[in-house]
From Swiss-Prot:
One of its GO terms (biological process) is rRNA processing. GO terms for cellular component: Pwp2p-containing subcomplex of 90S preribosome; small-subunit processome. InterPro entries: Utp18 (IPR045161), WD40/YVTN_repeat-like_dom_sf (IPR015943), WD40_repeat_dom_sf (IPR036322), WD40_rpt (IPR001680). PANTHER family: U3 SMALL NUCLEOLAR RNA-ASSOCIATED PROTEIN 18 HOMOLOG, WD-REPEAT PROTEIN-RELATED. It comes from Caenorhabditis elegans. SUPFAM superfamilies: WD40 repeat-like. WD repeats lie at residues 117-156, 295-336, 345-386, 392-428. Keywords: Nucleus, Repeat, rRNA processing, WD repeat. Belongs to the WD repeat UTP18 family. It is found in: Nucleus, Nucleolus. This is U3 small nucleolar RNA-associated protein 18 homolog.
């Protein structure tokens, strides 16, 4: 029997056109272990999917459950005739992209920002969504752009801007990727920097927003809305371009962190200093805003939050170092959701949390102690024991983020150091 390599692009032996038009109703009540894997927070209320989407979710859930494609499900090289007859429409030859839970292979890129390092603490690291660029902001009012590429070995610096007497606390990418907007707790206005024209613009909130320093703000994914956290337990929602005041959200306490839901420009998730979580919907013109509130499990003082790209997971951090990971669906639908799991490796206040694009990997850090940076394998609910390396030192990590496809992770530190790691399992930027 002749041998040949199995080709992934081969077509199934038959194709039923009725399968393409089939609509599948996703059950509203499923087991906890399957709920996150099959349902999406962006699904319509009736929960109907086309067959291709449903099959894709089943396959993804299976691979996550079993830590990859099991040996019996992988095709081996065999007879051409035999292979063409036995192959089914299920597409079992999909590439295994699941992250192993035992060890993670990373490389620290040495001297990433050599020649362009400041001594002021780095407060924000952001990867551009469509261009291989890392954006770094610090308490000296500096915004720097670096090229992210395996081909670039030396000078990765692209450009920078400095805002005098404007220590940056928050930064968001705006204008559909063309600009960044920065805020400072010492100033009552925002600064916008156009990365293409290098123009700098001062953005003043309207008079309906109290004049106060802006430590914290967020921008929706479509750059339509901008939310500013006030000092009086309020969130002020503005049009990002006109700065028109749209609505005000009242909170049980001051906000520690705010984020727009990744795919819903009118939905804001907030963690309060006292541990309450508020999910607020801005509402359409002429309608009232609505909100849903619950208390983070075991939290006394909330510090930060993160939402996975598809909203399947929601993570919170507290001053005790505990990170709770919830199902996004549970948070929406329950007034007392229970975490899927929690991570207790940090013993000091959590400063930042980030999910990679497919939510297989979560990074958590604290800027109170050296080397308080951990990587979590989400499916197995465990941390990688080989990260960070014993001989490596990450000083007082304040902020962390993954590149769009997970190939890189950036960590900003209080002493101005910038650490950029290659995550070898994910080869793309």
């Amino acid at each position: 029997m002749s041998k040949r390599p199995v080709i992934e692009s081969e077509k199934p032996a038959w194709h039923d056109e009725d399968d393409d038009n089939m609509v599948v109703a996703v059950p509203k009540k499923v087991k906890m272990t399957m709920r996150v894997e099959l349902k999406r927070t962006t699904d319509e209320e009736h929960g109907e999917l086309d067959s291709k989407e449903y099959v894709g979710r089943l396959q993804e859930a299976f691979r996550k459950r079993h830590g990859g494609t099991p040996k019996w499900a992988k095709a081996a090289a065999g007879d051409e005739e035999e292979g063409s007859l036995l192959k089914t429409a299920a597409g079992y030859l999909a590439k295994d992209v699941n992250l192993p839970k035992t060890t993670i292979h990373t490389t620290l890129i040495k001297d990433f920002n050599i020649g362009h390092r400041y001594t002021r603490g780095i407060t924000v690291v952001k990867f551009h969504k469509t261009r291989p660029v890392l954006i770094v902001a610090d308490q000296g009012g500096n915004v720097q752009l670096f090229k992210v590429s395996r081909e670039v070995k030396k000078d990765r610096f692209l450009q920078s801007a400095n805002f005098s007497k404007f220590p940056i606390d928050s930064l968001e990418i705006a204008d559909k990727g063309h600009s960044v907007i920065c805020s400072s707790s010492r100033k009552e206005y925002l600064m916008q920097y156009n990365m293409e024209t290098r123009e700098v613009t001062q953005l003043k909130p309207p008079n309906t927003v109290p004049k106060q320093g802006i430590r914290l703000f967020a921008i929706s994914h479509d750059s339509q809305f901008l939310a500013i956290a006030g000092h009086n337990s309020h969130i002020y929602v503005l049009h990002a371009t006109s700065m028109e005041h749209i609505t005000t959200i009242s909170l049980p306490a001051n906000a520690s962190e705010i984020k727009f839901f990744p795919s819903h420009s009118r939905e804001i998730w907030i963690i309060c200093e006292t541990g309450q979580i508020v999910i607020a919907n801005i509402g359409l013109p002429g309608t009232k805003s609505s909100q849903h509130t619950f208390t983070d499990d075991g939290a006394v003082h909330g510090t930060t939050l993160a939402i996975s790209q598809h909203g399947d997971y929601f993570a919170t951090g507290s001053d005790t170092g505990i990170v709770n990971v919830y199902s996004g669906n549970d948070c929406r639908n329950s007034t007392n959701p229970r975490p899927l799991f929690n991570v207790s490796n940090l013993v000091t206040a959590v400063s930042s949390i980030a999910f990679n694009s497919d939510a297989q990997l979560m990074a958590i850090c604290s800027n109170v102690k050296d080397n308080h940076l951990r990587l979590v394998h989400v499916a197995s609910q465990t941390t990688f024991k080989n990260f960070p390396e014993r001989n490596g030192k990450v000083t007082h990590a304040r902020c962390v983020e993954f590149s769009p496809n997970g190939g890189y992770m950036a960590v900003g530190n209080d002493d101005g150091r910038l650490h950029v790691f290659e995550i070898h399992h994910f080869t793309d930027y």
